Amino acid sequence: MELFQDVVPQTAENFRALCTGEKGMGDRKPLHYKGSSFHRVIPGFMCQGGDFTAGNGTGGESIYGAKFKDENFIKKHTGPGVLSMANAGPGTNGSQFFICTEKTAWLDGKHVVFGQVVEGMDVVRAIEKVGSQSGQTKKPVKIADCGQLS
């Protein structure tokens, strides 16, 4: 993953720190993606994960507290591999994110794009294959480990 730290530094830092787990405990659980799942996968659209508190898309927590505001909408949902924040409306970013598997221009101005898959798109495509139109996965898809590469 390449994170757009120059364009959306707060959003990129949230994702990076949740990958490393370096911030320790959140409200009730560690602030870490490790062991969490991709709970919503829709082929031809996106793979969504990052809810490490509830595991079903209703939870999540940022390193800044429960939620944080939309930083900006400079980057767009231009195609496969775009990394963007999932939310429940304006200013509700937490830890949930999604990886686009196609261009999703209708999300521009609503979800903050903060990165791009630069290597491993084959893994994203493999995750996409276990999804369904309802978003439910045919089998669990877990983040076995995560961190930061130098």
Swiss-Prot record:
It catalyses: [protein]-peptidylproline (omega=180) = [protein]-peptidylproline (omega=0). Its main location: cytoplasm. GO terms for molecular function: cyclosporin A binding; peptidyl-prolyl cis-trans isomerase activity. It is found in: Cytoplasm. Its EC number is 5.2.1.8. GO terms for cellular component: cytoplasm. CDD domains: cyclophilin_ABH_like (cd01926). It is an enzyme of class 5 (isomerase). SUPFAM superfamilies: Cyclophilin-like (SSF50891). Residues 1-148 form the PPIase cyclophilin-type domain. Belongs to the cyclophilin-type PPIase family. This is Peptidyl-prolyl cis-trans isomerase. It comes from Allium cepa (Onion).
